[in-house]
């Protein structure tokens, strides 16, 4: 029992020493960073319970306050998502930003738009094989039909 308590103490000190990761400084949105902090805090809270209690009922009793804290933390994180955005975030498609490629300088397409245009039309300018995924499925279906006829 003493070894177990020392292990719990050691892991608790280790968790405190490593501190919470700084998700907000990694370029994450505030809401996502808040949720990741909630998960980290929940894991750190549950570790001693996992080490101390082997029976399910005692473990659940031990973890119950941790789970309540996690739910409260998530509710607090919804506050960050509910705040109105004054500026569009980079990479988001707000109010017609998706059509920028069509309005490029001198009628040139942007890098990503060319690939999307080829994928939608199915016509490539390389002059290579024009075999599509549907052709492969048709060939495979023909083989299966022949196999069914041979089994009779």
Curated annotation (Swiss-Prot):
Residues 82-113 have a biased composition (Basic and acidic residues). It is found in: Secreted. It comes from the Eukaryota. Residues 82-152 are annotated as: Disordered. GO terms for cellular component: extracellular region. Residues 1-19 form the signal peptide. Prismatic layer of shell (at protein level). Expressed primarily in the mantle with highest level in the mantle edge and lower level in the mantle pallium. Residues 135-152 have a biased composition (Acidic residues). Keywords: Secreted, Signal. The keyword Signal applies. Coiled coil: none annotated. This is Aspartate-rich protein. It comes from Margaritifera margaritifera (Freshwater pearl mussel).
């Amino acid at each position: 029992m003493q070894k177990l308590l020392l292990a719990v103490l050691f892991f608790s000190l280790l968790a405190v020493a490593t501190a919470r990761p700084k998700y907000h400084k990694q370029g994450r949105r505030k809401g996502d960073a808040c949720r990741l902090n909630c998960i980290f805090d929940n894991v750190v809270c549950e570790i001693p319970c996992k080490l101390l209690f082997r029976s399910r009922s005692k473990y659940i009793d031990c973890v119950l306050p941790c789970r309540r804290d996690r739910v409260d933390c998530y509710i607090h994180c919804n506050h960050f998502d509910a705040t109105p955005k004054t500026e569009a975030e980079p990479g988001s498609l707000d109010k017609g930003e998706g059509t920028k490629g069509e309005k490029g300088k001198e009628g040139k397409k942007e890098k990503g738009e060319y690939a999307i245009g080829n994928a939608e039309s199915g016509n490539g300018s390389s002059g290579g094989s024009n075999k599509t995924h549907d052709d492969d499925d048709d060939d495979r279906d023909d083989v299966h039909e022949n196999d069914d006829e041979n089994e009779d």
